[in-house]
Every structure is written in structure tokens, then in C-alpha cells.
Amino acid sequence: MTTKNRQIKNFTSNFGPQHPAAHGVSRSVLEMNGEVVERAEPHIGLLQRGTEKLIEYKTYLQALPYSDRSEYVSMMAQEHAHSSAVERLLNCEVPLRAQYIRVLFREITRISNHSLALTTHAMDVGASTPFLWAFEEREKLLEFYERVSGARMHASFIRPGGVAQDLPLGLCIDIDSFTQQFASRIDELEEMSTGNRIWKQRLVDIGTVTAQQAKDWGFSGVMLRGSGVCWDLRKAAPYDVHDQLDPDIPVGTRGDRYDRYCIRIEEMRQSVRIIVQCLNQMPSGMIKADDRKLCPPSRSRMKLSMESSIHHFEPYTEGFSVPAPSTYTAVEAPKGEFGVFLVSNGSNRPYRRKIRAPCFAHSQGLDSMSKHHMPADVVTIIGTQDIVSGEVDR
């Protein structure tokens, strides 16, 4: 009896971009040895819209809506990064009430983002009930968006110098009512997943990232804290009124998908805590900087005097000029450190606005995180990275 040596070749498989579990228009090429993934190569650029170039032809105020559409799940965090960069170049001081409103809605955005990320991640594993439960609560958060801006998603609410308008009557009461009942909703989600045997089998020790790997790849947010690195810009480099608030920063130990799940659950609890602190500490006062070149007057005041009409007309047509230096401003967005490198040449349009997108850094870890796992695990690894293609491709 003779034996023959046969060389087994790996084969490649396309995952996405049309696959519903690809979390957007993303494509990955998987090199597989049987049912084991040997290599996963993300192919980006399918949702590239030229955002950074388009902004160079807009005024600083007209550039704001592009921030909403860059990462369309946590919109106000991107608005805040752009507005803060402009304010830093202008050396503009934002009123205290506006700072509290900004923090309030950024934490509402964080809850909205995590509730979507966690429950779509659960659907990747095979659990559909948490998704339906969470969307009932997320609908309330989008209604809060709508009440302050008129839009459910692309709000353009956080603007250079402050916020677009003050909180409508009764909104703070409704937000407080939401915080009182949302903790029990988180408990229900945990009851479905945290101790579930199948859930833990699919998540524990899968997609592991060490602390050094997370630093080398430029991870931030939950992806960094899940690997045991306690780094949160709200604590490490406080902005707005974060130095007056007192949340806890959850940190993982193993760096696997289960740790990142637990951190997102706890971050929703801490966001509720921050929202309650903002509601209790928020003072009365102005919600825009007292600079009519930067912040136009309200429409009601515009009809009372010629000066108000002029001050309302100029910012929306010509815009305002920003001094020539450059600045880098970063905020702790729900997905990680979202940064804006803004270069001004002294005109009313940015010379360059470079976006530091956390999802772009996280996507490069897909190969290492997927190695020697099954194709079904690749789906959930993309889910635990919480990637949005619009932010990756810009």
C-alpha cells in the first residue's frame, strides 16, 4: 500500500460588503484553512465620500453637518469635536449652561450608541430579543434629539460657541424620568445575556487583545479599556464640565469580547449617573457665547432691529474668520477617541480638517483578533469592535 503526500491549499472567501452582519458597507477577505480563519484582511473605502475634501469648500458652520454624517450612530460627539476645535482657535469661552447641555446630550448619545452596538452584537451571536427591547428605549433617546433640534439623527445641535437653542420646557423632567426606569432595562438585558452559558461560550477568550497590542494599534475607548488600560479623556484630559462630574471608568482584565461587552453595559450605567448629575447641577444662563460674529441672534430678535438682522445674515452666508494656527481637539466618543486636526489660514473656510476616526484604528486589528477562530467568530469580532463604515471611510 502506497501513500501520497498532498499539499492542502488555503482558500479565500469574501465576507461582505452586502452581508447583513458586516455592520455597514464593509468587505473582508478571509483566508481559511478548512473552517479555521488564518487571515482576515479588511478592504475599506466602499463608503468613501470625500468628507475631508468637501469641508475645505464650506464655512466653519456649513462644515458642521458633515460631522453628523461621518459616524451616524453617535452624532453629537462628532459635532462637539468640530465645535471645540473651532472654539480653541478662536479662544472662545462657552457658557457654563451650554457646557452642561453638551455633556448631557453626549451621554444620551453614548447610551444610544451602546444600546445599538450591544444588541446588534447579540443578534450576531443569535439572540434577537435584546435588540427589540433596546430599540424601544433607544426610540425615547431619539425623541430627545428631536425635541432639541427637530431631527432624530443629524441634529447639528452642538455648534461653535454653544448649542443651537435652549432645552424646551419639560425636557429635563422627561430625561429624569428616563434615567429612573432605564437601570431596570439594563438589568433585563443583562439577565438575558451576562450569565447565559451560550453567550459566554461565544464571547469568552475570543478576539483577545493585549494591552500592548491595543496601544500599538492606536485603540481607544472600549477597545483600549477592555485590555486593561485605564484611559478615558473625560478623566485623563477633562473638557467642558467633566472635571465637576464623578463617574467611574470600567476597565477589563482579559481583553476579550466578554470584557468589552461588560464594559459597555457598565458605561451605560455610568452615563445615566452623569446625566443625573448634569440635571442636578445645570445652572440657568446663556447657551451661546456673547459674540454676534460667531453666534447669530435668535429669529425673534432678528425682527426687532436692523443690527440683529445683519448679525443673523452674516454667519449663515459669509461665515466667520478663524485665526491662522492649527489645533488638535479630541473627545471621548462612544466608539473611542474622536479627534479633529483643524488647520486655518485665517479665512472663513478651513484649510484642512483631518479626522482621527477610532473605527479606522480598530479595523486594523481584525486580522490578529480573528486568527485561528471560526468564520462565525469574525462576524461577532466586527460587532465587538463596534465599527461604522462611514467613520472608517469618511
From Swiss-Prot:
InterPro entries linked to this entry: NADH_Q_OxRdtase_suD, NDH1_su_D/H, NiFe-Hase_large
Keywords: Electron transport, Mitochondrion, NAD, Oxidoreductase, Respiratory chain, Translocase, Transport, Ubiquinone
Organism: Nicotiana sylvestris
Similarity comment: Belongs to the complex I 49 kDa subunit family.
Polar residues bias: start-end ranges: 1-16
NCBIfam families: NuoD, PRK06075.1
One GO biological process term: mitochondrial electron transport, NADH to ubiquinone
Catalytic reactions on record: a ubiquinone + NADH + 5 H(+)(in) = a ubiquinol + NAD(+) + 4 H(+)(out)
Protein name (record): NADH dehydrogenase [ubiquinone] iron-sulfur protein 2
Highest taxon of source: Eukaryota
Gene name for this UniProt entry: NAD7
Region (Disordered): 1-22
Signal peptide start-end: none
Subunit details: Complex I is composed of about 45 different subunits. This is a component of the iron-sulfur (IP) fragment of the enzyme.
EC number: 7.1.1.2
